[in-house]
Amino acid sequence: MSTYLIGDVHGCYDELIALLAQVEFDPSTDTLWLTGDLVARGPGSLEVLRYVKSLGDSVRLVLGNHDLHLLAVFAGISRNKPKDRLKSLLEAPDADELLNWLRRQPLLQVDEEKKLVMAHAGITPQWDLETAQQCARDVEAVLSSDSYPFFLDAMYGDMPNHWSNELSGLARLRFISNAFTRMRYCFPNGQLDMYSKEAPEDAPAPLKPWFAIPGPVSNAYSIAFGHWASLEGRGTPEGIYALDTGCCWGGELTCLRWEDKQYFTQPSNRQKSLDEGEAVAS
């Protein structure tokens, strides 16, 4: 009975299946955690969604910004970009079933026994766990309702970038989705910076990676996240696990077995890209 955490799959179905075979994943006894961005850029987004959905209770995932963008395309709000390679998914006979399943997935996973939290981009240091859980529920409730297109239409934007319990309506939901799915850097007070994407050693002062600013959640829990492929899984404090290692850019798909903290990797089938590129809706 093992727990396997895998970084952003981005439609890299063959690599996902190879990595799961490498660790001898058994869905009848093991649990798979996925950091989000299941889709886009790789050639197998349709196959990834079908497979992950088939795992049922054996998988715990969170939504990423590419997953949200796919839902916006599905709802007719955003256009499908050829580089995302989503055409076969959007035209599949089971697209409605898959995407209505996807929009009912969470933004946050918490395991109190393991003292483990997972979100696609991380947890803003401005939140304690109770606030993070409530904020996740706020967006999840809208996404799973019939009014989800109204949120998806309003989610694109960088403001507000500072948390307050006084935030309400679509502005509140936009901050929450940005914090869970797009965040990289923060100012020392925890305010989000939505523009900088360079490596931490090149980031302009006073910006810091969100995980370099102590917060109530990181002080009490381990945090697993994806989203930030250019970190290449390095440079995080103890207890913070960066799992996106850029498989869709020619890097690797990374798996962490939680029980013994052993890492496994599967090389990408694609040529290494020098440009990580810009994530859609980021």
Swiss-Prot record:
It catalyses: P(1),P(4)-bis(5'-adenosyl) tetraphosphate + H2O = 2 ADP + 2 H(+). Gene3D superfamilies: 3.60.21.10. Signal peptide: none annotated. One of its GO terms (molecular function) is bis(5'-nucleosyl)-tetraphosphatase (symmetrical) activity. Keywords: Hydrolase. Its EC number is 3.6.1.41. SUPFAM superfamilies: Metallo-dependent phosphatases. CDD domains: MPP_ApaH. InterPro entries: ApaH, Calcineurin-like_PHP_ApaH, Metallo-depent_PP-like. Coiled coil: none annotated. Belongs to the Ap4A hydrolase family. Hydrolyzes diadenosine 5',5'''-P1,P4-tetraphosphate to yield ADP. This is Bis(5'-nucleosyl)-tetraphosphatase, symmetrical.
